[in-house]
Amino acid sequence: MKTNNIESFKFKTMKNIMKRSLLIGMALFIAGTVSAQNFRYIGADNCKTCHNKPEQGAQYDKWWYEDLHSQALESLSSEKAVEYAKKNGIADASKEPKCLKCHSTYHAAPENLRDGITENEGVSCEGCHGAGSNYRGTTIMRNRSFAVRGGLILQTEELCLKCHNQECPFYKWFDFKRDFERITHPNLSGTH
């Protein structure tokens, strides 16, 4: 009789622990989802403040003047893009949502979170690194894990393949290691 009571008590205790763990897990998941939805886009000019310093390798200038990502939106008005659009019944590639999702951070961002960016940025810093409102501060940027919790996205092959894939009519074979080296703008200060 005593053994049954003990077993019953253990079972109820374990059941309560499992329920609480599940509730805590769900609460954390929901909190993470809600906070991720609150990351706002702040625009490349805000990144420029810190990321164009010589000691950091003038990252912004390298991106803006040398990296094709910053010119991605302009490429939709190229002769090649206009010709492709015409052949495929697209009135204007620079206004086509299927094209804009990869050629413009502004158009790819949720409308209610993009008030800090402009249409003409092409694929801006936040197109690859994530909306910067919660990780832009110097204190946060000095600690990678804080920055990631604040919305910083670490570059992975999967991230790049969201756009660099065979859905693009001008797709060229994508080699993450090789191509990442072409666009890298290392942070020489040791932050993020």
Task: Describe the function of each predicted region.
Residues 6-25:
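Bacterial N-terminal signal peptides that target proteins for export
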Residues 25-28, 129:
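Alpha-helical transmembrane segments
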Residues 31-33:
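N-terminal signal peptide c-region/cleavage motif recognized by signal peptidases
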Residues 36-121, 126, 132-155, 173-192:
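Sequence context of c-type cytochrome heme-c attachment sites
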Residues 158:
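Cys/His-rich zinc-coordinating modules
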Residues 167-168:
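Functional cores that coordinate and move charged inorganic groups
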